[in-house]
Amino acid sequence: DAITEFIDTTKEEGIPVDGFQLSSGYCAIETEEGIKRCVFTWNKKRFKDPKDFFAQMKKRGVCVSPNVKPGILLIHPKLEEMKAKGMFVKASETEEPGIGTWWGGQGMFVDFTSQETRDNWKEMLKENVLNYGTSSVWNDNCEYDSMVDKDCRCSFEGKGGTIGQLKSVMSNIMCQISNEAVHETFDNTRPYVVCRSGHAGIQRYAQTWAGDNLTCWDSLKYNIATILGMGLSGVANQGCDIGGFYGVSPEAELLVRWIQNGIFQPRFSIHSTNIDNTVTEPWMYSNCTEYIRTAIKFRYRLFPYLYSLMERAHETGLPIMEAMCSAFQNDPKCYEEGVDFMFGDSLLVANVVEKGAKTRKVYLPEGNTFYDFYTRTPYNGGQTIELPVDLGSIPLFVKGGAIIPMASNQMKNLMTEQPAGISILCAPDCDGSFTLYEDDGVSMDYEKGCYLKTFVSMTAGERTVLTFKQEGSYATSVETMALDMIHREKAPYWVTVDGKEIPHFLHRRKFEEAECGWYYSQTLKSVQVKYLNPKKDHQVVVSFEQFDLIGM
């Protein structure tokens, strides 16, 4: 009830939510040595009916990821059964299982390098977790570091090996099994697996995060560097425990700044075990809740852009949060930067990460034009600028050539809502391109062609042309299209959609009331275009050509 109440409160506060990562307290049961956390068991006082719990969360549009660990306490009720099946890493000098330190005492550790063990673990996962109604798993504490004797022996597919040699593969295999178990339990369902650790290739099976971080300002900065480094290593689907995991509760300013950075992380999760008996919640400081609400809602507006970047990472391995030295390899000054990053190819993010900051210095890479996301103020690259900031500031810059699709409607839950319209922010200083990706988000149908890729190409010039070409059979939810085209020099002469000139409005209110047309915003120095989504290949032409006033 406390968890469903938390989700309901989040919705009442107007804060979007889609997932809940269920910590291992759900499997804290009464044993001979007191309350202990035993994987694949349920505390029936806290969860009288696990199946109903998952059903209630699904009804609220929330995906639950239960915590699963590979260590088995010596007082675990299933220990002897697992031991008899030979599921554990063996001691270095005997045929008995090796023993190491675990949560709440001594424990044995599952050997995932054995096919028989993998099959048994998969069945236990299905029977004790997935069959209750979740297609998500949170694999945790799978580094095997607490096995002090690194000569403990693993099967290694019958060839033999030591845990010292093989511990790095355990988390990858554990996540692979989790994916297989979901596919075997649910028809046509996309697994969602989260894992704290892994070696090269973990991105094939799981989303990862930067571990149990300390709640402090330094961690905020270090976590950004960690995520950027993981992106350079091919692990794009990454994040951190926002607000800090361990320590006293975050002060208000730190929490706001962490969330403002977290909205750009592929994995956004506020997660804590505060030592002052508090819980980190987005509304814990009432005077800051609006800043937090605004930031998280902005993440949901960016969903079409982020989801497309996720698909790009899936296909190519390219980062979502990209280090400046990677995005601008020919600019030596970008090799000195460890906090700013590119969010995709089009957005430069310069979060405020210093306590009490009143200004923020930002280096803009040379050879590019950048625009303030909010004011559209232009800046030439190759210079450091200094901006005034307050607690609500999230400094963002649009790179010349940018194409950034955003949701026109404000969604608060992606399981129950979809983008009704797409608004594309673009900056035609130069040519640009972007692939907008859509699918149902939950099934495996995308493997059968049930997706929609819209290849958007922009040719800049006196006649700026945006061409939309589609691939795939997915039926989009998008009914309206809008363009927000930065063009400070002058307004257009005319705008066409598929060769047909659309109405020009001189008054903003009349433009807003119309279904189709264009308007030039003097405030933003931007061309605003909107039209019904043709749901097919089409072209938009915006003419900035000189025209004859007498001829008008």
Which residue ranges define each predicted feature?
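Intrinsically disordered, low-complexity acidic/polar segments
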Residues: 29, 73-75, 202, 358, ...
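Acidic/polar residues at beta-strand termini and the immediately following turn/coil
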Residues: 111, 372, 439, 512, ...
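A broad, low-specificity signal marking well-ordered, structured residues that form hydrophobic/aromatic
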Residues: 191, 341, 347, 394, ...
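Short, surface-exposed beta-strand/turn "edge" patches of beta-sheet domains
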Residues: 378-390, 504-535
